[in-house]
Amino acid sequence: DQLKADLLLILDGPMHSSKKPTLVFGNRGIASITLKVYGPKTSQHSGHYGNFIPNPALRLTKVLSSMKSDDGRVIIPGFYDGIRITDQVKSVLKKIPSEDELIKKRTKIKSVDKVAESYQESIQYPSLNIRGLQSGWVGSQVRTIIPSIAQAEIDVRLVLESDPLRLINLIKTHIESLGYKI
């Protein structure tokens, strides 16, 4: 009873470039996945075992690249099922001054993913993001090895119509369809 409330106000996220007050009626949720691909029991010298022992880092990158198209859409069957942006919502989104070019300039990117027609519309869809990769050694620690493991951290951003367990199961099914065991 003490925590009962009519409203929750969160002051978070980027301000619109117009600097005008903005009401946001929800934020995307999150589901997280740790994906590991295993190779040899211990790292092996690539000069001795390259072309014989499969490299888990290469295999992991192939799994990850199979999840999205070159234009940024998740291509796992069913990922966007049930997501509907009504004409009314699209109309409201189009009234928001576009920040697409400003975001590109500020973040120093040349192109954007083509999940939707605009930034505002794109955040109405669930997303699949690789937030981290780890395998072997790089930089001053570089070694000529086939690593024993490769790991990716993935976040799936959820919208109202998204069922996190359904999306995670779709990802699992996709990975299994590539011949991997989960």
How should these model regions be labeled?
Residues D1, S177-I182:
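Short, intrinsically disordered, charge-balanced linker/junction segments flanking boundaries
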Residues D1-S111, E117-P126:
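Fold-level recognition of mixed alpha/beta catalytic cores in primary-metabolism enzymes, strongest
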Residues G39-S43, S148-E153, I182:
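Short acidic (Asp/Glu) and glycine-rich catalytic loops that position anionic groups and cofactors
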Residues H48-N55, V142, I146, V159:
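Short alpha-helix boundary/capping segments
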Residues E161-L167:
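Short, conserved charged micro-motifs
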Residues L167-E176:
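Short amphipathic alpha-helices in soluble, non-transmembrane regions
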